[in-house]
Amino acid sequence: MSADRVRLPDLIDRLPADERDITTRLATAFLDAGHELFLVGGIVRDLLLDRGRTDLDFTTSAVPEETKAASVAARPDSVYLVGEEYGTVGLVFRVDPEALPITVEVTTFRSEVYPTEDRRPVVTHGVSLVDDLSRRDFTINALALDPLAGELVDPFNGITDLAHRRIVAVGDAGERFNEDPLRVLRAARFASQLGFDIDPDTLDAMRETGPQLARISRERIAAELNRLLVGDR
């Protein structure tokens, strides 16, 4: 096991039973088809913090057509393409007829390059899991869980930052915020929602990037501010 993988075999048990069953079915189906599949992002962060339910998001080595084919064995009720450019496939599971269906998203490993300031990245599929995690905003969101092996993949020390209750940008903070200035508000939102502090270098980059929020649409800013205002501090 590499240094950035940690054995946490019981972490998946924190999922509600229906979501745990879906996760196991999907992971088994993808493994049988020869693909990697990981829970990724906010769901992993919130499982580690033992917080409430977060949407199930997966990342995979499979491209969308392979994802749709592999998912058949997991018996979803419907499959749809969320965004072809980003390699995302949505799966709907109607587990309980008395409850809302459970919708999950499965996205192909990808890297992103932002050649201009219009926020439209050039997306490359077929990269590694670590490459995929490296494009994410903060270390606490750059975490992936192998549901079957019970291994947490943590190449950017997100577990340490969770333990120290701090928001730290992945890699170069200035680059992360320049890629998408809305991340300035996202950092503030996570600090508010989780009661975390913001790492000094990350905070400096936020101050430098703040004026660039002027190029973000009012709708996106308003949506992020609404999420920020419901935080605890």
Question: Where is each model-derived feature located?
Answer:
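Catalytic cores of the polymerase beta-like nucleotidyltransferase superfamily
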Residues: 1-233
